[in-house]
Amino acid sequence: MKLKLELMQMTKKNMADVVTCIGVAAILSVIVFTIPNEIPIGEMAYQKLWLGRMAVVFVVCSLLSLCLNRKQYLSFPAIVTWVLIALGGIEAAWGMRQIYGLAVSNHSLYALTGSFYNPGPYSGYLAMIFPLCLHEWLNLKERTERTWVEQGKYYMALGVMLLILCVLPAGMSRSAWMAAAVSGIWVYGIHASWATWLKEAGQKYKKTMITGLVIGGLVLIMIGYVLFQLKAASANGRLLMWKISCLAIAESPVVGHGADGFVSAYGRAQEEYFANGEYSETEELVAGSPEYAFNEYLQVAVEYGIPFLFVVLLVIAFCFWRGITEKQIGICGGVISVLVFALSSYPMQIPGFAMTFYFLLAACVIGRSKVALLFFILMIALLGAYYWKNNQYKACKEWYRSKMLYNIGAYQAAKEGYEKL
């Protein structure tokens, strides 16, 4: 009787894991959905629409999973990890096909974009998956006797990691390279217990350690200089964007300029800056009208103010601390990767990427807590409802159709289409 009860509990646990996996995979896989030709490439309305729909799938699956698995340990962090590794493998394979000309990219200027419309966010997504693969591979490598399931996971993590390492250099995203390097070194350092080794070495070989730190610092400066010169115009453009963003923050540091107010605030600040005449020739050459700050921290401060940015950073820090205490090393590595990438790119402006980051933070916090999972389910339900209700996909489709009619000279039909909007 006891054995039968245990078997029933195991069956329910496995069923709950499968259902949860379906829900997580449904919402996170939106990032690999191909944007239809009826709206412009890079428009986020289609992705938001499907995030709203898949949020319903995730909520239903998660609640059903909780009903099936009331007493057993939650597998949410592990499920998020392996779903992301699988999606990383799909994206990396997609990129390899584009490199060899077997698949078309989503941008006329770049051969490599994956399912994204630009190689920058695509590379950042792969950089986020890299520490997850590294952690799982190192973790499974330490086991001398692996089951066939663990053996499959071992080769899957290794294969995806190697694919990512093959594709990342071709993306030419310095931000993604730094994100992958920092998060990868952190994950490997945790596994190799570098903190303990450095503490002991610092006590025994103090002078040698100081010399090593100085040399390491010089090497980092040289690497930074090389990366800067690799695409100097792009780097100078971002420096100007950050400078103008800081000026925009100074105009309204407490409450910001409102949601989606970055473009207008940036435009005004840049106009005033150039009107003063205190600009360099390089800044004049690289100035433009960006949609994003290419620094998520500055973007949040511009739109919502410095206090809100401080609260966001506190929430992220709490989630990261919980992840460390729960020993979710790979997931914490993914969080580090996104945080580093966000210093010089715009991952949170892509809804699917942002949703993935929310799941990483949730996987850090949830651990064994069903209450935390319920709270996260509620958050995703509200976010999904917002995406679905306030979606502009139909309007974007009609606008794009009218624009095409205008371009071919069908002005009356285009006029009628624009009037509907």
Could you describe each region identified by the protein language model?
Residues 11-14, 18-37, 51-68, 76-108, ...:
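Alpha-helical transmembrane segments of multi-pass inner-membrane proteins
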Residues 241-251, 390-421:
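Membrane-interface segments at or immediately adjacent to transmembrane helices
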